[in-house]
Amino acid sequence: MRQTWVAACVAIVCLIGCRPAEVDHSQQPSATGPAATGPAATEKKAEALEQNAAAAGNKAPPSPSEMINKPEAQAVDPAGAEPLDDAITCLARTIYWEARGEATVDMEAIANVVMNRLGHEGFPNTICDVVRQGHEQGSCQFSWWCDGRSDQAKEDESYATAKEIARKALNLQLTDRTGGALYFHQRRATPGWAAEYAKTVQIGEFLFYKPRGGEAR
């Protein structure tokens, strides 16, 4: 009897103490690896948003997970000196150099023109190419790209505003204040081409236009 009782006790102890340790899966790395973070990941997001915005007739905003948030946008090109090779940087620098020192609504209107051109017939399908268009002939659509000066942003606050506007534009969260304009000039300028286009609106120091027949030239 005593031997039977001892054997039973040993069996119970083994059942309790010999169980394999449970794995805490919450501490294990994901099978797909950690989520990508940092400016490079944000630039990839921006590329996808750019393609979405360039799609003809696509006005539907992306899902929240696809959108760029404020910290992500500000982490890209923090010193305003990175190469112009991604959508956020190209758009933000254009906003900055075309309208720095002007009101926020003026800066937003410049972003509107870039986004209106994106994917429009007669214009490229990426923001950087939209901004650079014409530089091969020395006649850039956006003058800052061809002026021969440094492209580095020098005013932190103004450039931070430009990046925030670029973020909203890529997220399709920016109201088009220009009435679909594809062209603009400063109010004090009198370019010869202006008479060929229909003026849509004046915003601050800028006048905005679009083709009378709807086609870009």
Annotated model-derived regions:
Residues M1-V23:
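Sec-dependent N-terminal signal peptides
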Residues E22, A54, K59, P64-R217:
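Bacterial extracytoplasmic/cell-wall-associated proteins, especially those involved in peptidoglycan
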